[in-house]
Amino acid sequence: MDSSTANSSGTAISKAEWKPDQSSLECNDCQLPFTLIRRRHHCRKCGSIFCDSCSSFYSILPIEYGYTGQQRLCRSCNNSFEQKKQYFETDALVAQFQLRSTAQFEYSKPLQDIGHTKHGLRKSYCMAKNSMGGGEECVVSIITPTPSSCPWSMSNEKKKRKFEKTLLSLKHPYILTPINVEVSGANDKILVIRTFFKQGSLRDQVYKSKPLSPYDTKYIYKQPKSSSSSSSSSSSSSQSQSVLPIKSIQKYCKQILESLLYLKSKGIQFSHLHLSNILINQSNDTCQLVDIENCLLGMKPLFNDYIYGIGLPQSFKDNLEVICFGHCLFEMIIGIPLGDHSNINSFIPLFPDKVFLLLQQIFSEKTPTLEELVKNPWFEVTTTIEQQSLQNGKLKKSQLTFIKDNSNKFESPKVSLSGSFSSSNISKLSSSSSNNNSNNNNNNNNNSNTFNNISSNDDKRKSMKLPSSTSLLNNSFNLSNNNNPSSPSTSTISPNSSLISSPPKTPILQTFTPPPPPPPPKSAPPPPPPPSSSKLPPSSSSRNSLLESIRNADNAKKLKKTTPNTKPKSSIGPHSLKPSSTKKK
């Protein structure tokens, strides 16, 4: 299978390299060995080998991956892909509603994950059009700062306004100031709108990639084809590896250093410096820094794990911008990321003159400062900075204090717990815990003393066992009976009486395990039987005669004689009212 394909836009995208079947004898997920029945299957995203049950997930990958239709994915790739997909969809909806509220910008389309994977699920991008700027295209960064990472509260309206004004006030010729900043408090998202440069970033220029392609597919180092001759000079190899002209590298480096000095003068140590955060402005042939807001939102830098690693000198942590600048310089010349700083010794033949000595100076134990690095003769390139732009970049005192309080507050367990476990809170907790421990110790000592005084010499074993049980009971009841002075006095009672009175076990057992309900009493009357003749009302002569007439047809005459007896009972009827009314008249 060919490792590279071309999408509809004409950009070459490298697929994930499939591992050979012989390289894995068991599934990478369930660790079960492969057999004739349990066959090998490759994940289309990562290229690893799994069994059928561990890779039975199908999803449609973006066209940049070079596949069409649903493709087989492993469990981890499917979860991350679906999670990012849902996250991007929600961010796109938030951006649509937020941009619709402003009459200046119009939502165009969502973008793939063009940012670095270090941001995880906290950053996505979309395209918009500036209606007031002649319909120019803009890139909208949708940031979701987590509560543990953001040093200021998103629910504070004053902090929101201060963040917007501070970010818009940072103006410099080599810093791309946002056009607008929108804070969506309902969704805890921040929208930073910038001008879109078709040339992309410096990393796009190094890797010759499209700016809007996914991050994990466009930055793939491709080693140039070696010549037929086995021997090659160092000059020819340096020319093949130097992807950018040396003069352009010198000019860009000088501009980057000047922008870093401006940010340092405002109190921002821009540790988020890498080639993806340096855009190329072709109109005036300059480079401009972006994503300055990352320093004010507590997001981790790209080189955070490397700089704060074990065994690195303290000068690396004190000069974060210089270390990041050294990584950028190495990648602009060689064309691949540096990784560990000791790797520069492996590329000595590829460096131009004085560059290797400069990198050695940057990654030494005594790292130079920005002011010392700018004075290096290798950066002596004429650059003009307008004085008006520097005047526009001045900040107010309130904005400088906001930067001082919130800049470079990286997300870490210590930083996230600083609000709840401050020094004052720790002192309060320690004092309260010491008081509780002292009270408990005093109670235990009092209990043991009383029992030791009461117990006799012959009954030492019993007296040694009693304090442990009663002290536990007293400690448990002291929490609920702090205001009752009689509760601790139970320890002065004799051991036999304390054992009976102190543990209230019988009511607890009665409440939780009640006796079974008593059986129904025997004297209770049984359910009523069907009505019998004994309980019927007394029979009347009319009824008896009626029954006899039913039985014997000869009793019809008797029924006629007994009918007058029933008339007084029916005197209440409506016919009896007529004669009474006539008498009154």
Swiss-Prot record:
Q: Where does Zn(2+) 2 bind?
A: C43, C46, C74, C77
Show where the WH2 domain sits. 542-562
Q: Which segments carry the region annotation Disordered?
A: 426-585
Going by the UniProt record, its keywords in alphabetical order are: Actin-binding, Metal-binding, Zinc, Zinc-finger
One GO MF annotation is: protein kinase activity
List compositional bias (Pro residues) regions by residue number. Answer: 513-532
Bias (Low complexity) ranges: 426-456, 466-503, 533-542
| UniProt: Zn(2+) 1 binding residues | C27, C30, C51, C54
Record bears the keyword Zinc-finger: yes
Zn finger spans (FYVE-type): 21-82
Is this entry keyworded Zinc-finger? yes
Domain Protein kinase: residue ranges:
108-478
Q: Which InterPro entries does the entry mention?
A: Kinase-like_dom_sf, Ser-Thr/Tyr_kinase_cat_dom, WH2_dom, Znf_FYVE, Znf_FYVE-rel, Znf_FYVE_PHD, Znf_RING/FYVE/PHD
Give the family, as the similarity comment puts it. Answer: Belongs to the protein kinase superfamily. Ser/Thr protein kinase family.
- What does the entry's domain section say? The protein kinase domain is predicted to be catalytically inactive.
Q: What is this protein called?
A: Probable inactive serine/threonine-protein kinase slob1
Q: Which organism is it from?
A: Dictyostelium discoideum
What is the phylogenetic placement of the source species in the record? Eukaryota, Amoebozoa, Evosea, Eumycetozoa, Dictyostelia
Q: Which gene encodes it?
A: slob1
